């Protein structure tokens, strides 16, 4: 309980985040969980069809790969205001969110919030099923805290379209 309180208090002074995540790209490349269905999603977001689609929709040239992370936001989970710079971001071109949340109510929070340079909210996007959102980075954004009374989790796969080396195949198992 103390750790959670410290985390929330610290988020008021600097970037804070609290959610469950599974970093799909390194898991795929390192051969963890061979045959796991989530690896098909990693392969899909790195397919020429998806990468070319993302490049066309965003007008961003040079897209060569996509990172992927499965996210699960419980009541109280959030991501504070940030712009995706830093953290190995040098090759990030465009962020994406693929929504897997059904029947979400706006008062449950969890919206992807896009901010202007002063931090004012320009747009809030409700978690939805089968919705793909792109936005160029760096761009100020956050995820609103999920309300304590939300009836289920906010689930999505997020990542970045990048211009660095394409995702390699997982190692062959002997």
Predicted regions and their residues:
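Short secondary-structure capping micro-motifs at structural edges
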Residues: 38-41, 55-57, 80-85
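Amphipathic alpha-helical segments that form well-ordered structural scaffolds
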Residues: 49-57, 129
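Short N-terminal helix-initiation segments at or just after the protein's N-terminus
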Residues: 32-45, 59-60, 98-108, 173-174
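Catalytic core of Fe(II)/2-oxoglutarate
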Residues: 71-174
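Phosphate-binding glycine-rich loops and adjacent basic patches that engage nucleotide phosphates
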Residues: 2-19, 59-61, 90-96, 119-121, ...
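Membrane-targeting and insertion segments and their boundary/processing signals
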Residues: 24-28, 67, 117, 131
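Non-heme Fe(II)/2-oxoglutarate
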Residues: 1-52
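A short coil-to-beta-strand element that immediately follows conserved catalytic motifs
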Residues: 61-69, 108-109
């Amino acid at each position: 309980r103390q750790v959670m309180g410290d985390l929330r208090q610290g988020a008021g002074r600097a970037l804070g985040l609290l959610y469950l995540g599974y970093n799909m790209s390194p898991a795929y490349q390192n051969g963890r969980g061979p045959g796991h269905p989530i690896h098909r999603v990693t392969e899909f977001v790195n397919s020429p069809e998806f990468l070319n689609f993302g490049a066309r929709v965003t007008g961003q040239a040079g897209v060569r790969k996509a990172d992927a992370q499965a996210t699960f936001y419980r009541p109280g989970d959030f991501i504070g205001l940030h712009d995706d710079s830093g953290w190995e971001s040098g090759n990030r071109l465009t962020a994406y969110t693929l929504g897997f949340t059904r029947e979400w109510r706006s008062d449950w929070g969890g919206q992807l919030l896009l901010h202007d340079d002063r931090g004012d909210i320009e747009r809030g996007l409700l978690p939805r099923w089968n919705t793909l959102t792109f936005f160029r980075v760096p761009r100020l954004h956050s995820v609103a805290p999920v309300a304590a009374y939300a009836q289920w989790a906010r689930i999505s796969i997020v990542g970045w379209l990048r211009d660095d080396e394409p995702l390699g195949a997982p190692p062959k198992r002997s």
